Amino acid sequence: MQHDGSFNPEARFDAVLVGAGIMSATLAALLHELDTQLRILLVERLEAPALESSAAVNNAGTGHAANCELNYTPIQADGTVATAKAVAINTSFERSLEFWSSLQERGDLDTSSFLHQAAHISAVWTPENIAFLRQRFSQLKELPAFARMRWSEDQSELTEWMPLVMAGRDLKQPVAATRIDRGTDVDFGSLTRAYLMPLQQSGALSVEYGTQVHDLKRLRHSDMTEADWRVVLKGPSGKKEVRAPFVFLGAGGGALPLLQRSGIPEAADFAGFPVSGLWLVCGDAQLADRQRAKVYGKAAVGAPPMSVPHLDTRWVDGKRSLLFGPFAGFSSKFLKQGSLLDLPASVRATNLLPMLQVGATNFELVQYLINQLRQSPTQRHEALQQFMPTARAEDWTLSVAGQRVQIIKRSKQGGRLQLGTEVVASGDGSLAALLGASPGASTAVTIMLEVLERCFKQRLDSDAWQQRLQALLPSIHEDPHQDPQVLNRMRERSDALLGLTA
């Protein structure tokens, strides 16, 4: 390994990105678009990109636009539903579509490799849940983002919308659904590779696969660049040192241990709660072809957000697939290919109490996970039959999904389980990490714009970067939720370039 006196200047980069998933790939693409001269290094512990949570079969949900995911509009004490989170997620997904459209327009991205249209449907079948869905529909329908949402309780129409859900169902059972035709499925594994390949081929991005971060330390010696991070990598050829003024930790569940290792004070506020997942995957191609929508149901009480049950049309490696789940479970690993010691190794004096407080105050979640762990194959099949009454056990196989690490955050009120994602950045903006899970990938562009705002603020405010950003995201300084004309303009452009229909 190189030491200070013999440090090779070629091993100094403008940015080191850890984890070759959709987040780091999006950040690499944005940074290169804003400054083609930046030297960027991507480090990945596995042998190829997008093998953890970004992979199509590992992702808990794809194409999240809050059209059908009922957990983004929770019921409130007065009987109405909260809509702010749904609007924010929808706006973020429109921003992703806008970015992909710009790259597609220039011929720099083939969106047909990862983006497919699939209707987004919410379906429920108990009086209580139907009342909830009706309230949700009545409120969202009034918002520009969801104005084209449709409602139905008509058996024949519902059969057209979701034939597998309605086939064999008791005609006396009340069923209601909402539908948005302009929904999508996104293969984020394919998108990750589509971002990275041209950057690698052009020499704008250096990649180290089969390599992990062994040490991460801020350099403050007088004879060195003041702002640099010293990153020691351990790969097939041993250890080596690289340096950079900026480090991004986008390694999914692996981001928390690296954030803790960085020593920045902001890391002390966080702990992680890992949740694993399982899918039932349909092996009958004819059945998969009949289902042309994502059908989301209502989550059980206490269920984490990545465990909302759905019958999911999903493209995996270019092939239409049909999945049901995900069923939640528990593993102390922070990554699917991680270590059982990940959770205990993350415990610190600063986060032990918040973790215990979350365990004591989230009994419903703990009980839910225990019940999920106890599920037999028969019970999982019965859950599938609630969605698809004619489902046969022999047509479905069990597949392990990706690992999620929910955020536990220390606050004045004690530890709390925080849903969603959060960017944690050092005070000087030299290091950022992304923690959390759903909706994640679908909002990657918005999340990485936040990283740029917090870590590259001076350059982001420059005329050069603003002009380039405006070219990539024409509506970047406008709010589509507040101005329906802006939303319509965004959607018309994206739909034309991406081949989406309303």
Curated annotation (Swiss-Prot):
Pfam family, one: Mqo
Signal peptide (from-to): none
Pathway noted in the entry: Carbohydrate metabolism; tricarboxylic acid cycle; oxaloacetate from (S)-malate (quinone route): step 1/1
Record EC number: 1.1.5.4
GO biological process: tricarboxylic acid cycle
UniProt keyword Electron transport present: no
Gene Ontology MF terms: 2-hydroxyglutarate dehydrogenase activity; L-malate dehydrogenase (quinone) activity
Gene3D superfamilies: D-Amino Acid Oxidase, subunit A, domain 2, FAD/NAD(P)-binding domain
Keywords, in A-Z order: FAD, Flavoprotein, Oxidoreductase, Tricarboxylic acid cycle
Recorded catalytic activity of this chain's protein: (S)-malate + a quinone = a quinol + oxaloacetate
Classification via InterPro entries: FAD/NAD-bd_sf, MQO
Required cofactor names: FAD
PANTHER family, A to Z: L-2-HYDROXYGLUTARATE DEHYDROGENASE, MITOCHONDRIAL (PTHR43104:SF2)
Family: Belongs to the MQO family.
Name under which the protein is recorded: Probable malate:quinone oxidoreductase
Organism for this UniProt entry: Synechococcus sp. (strain CC9605)
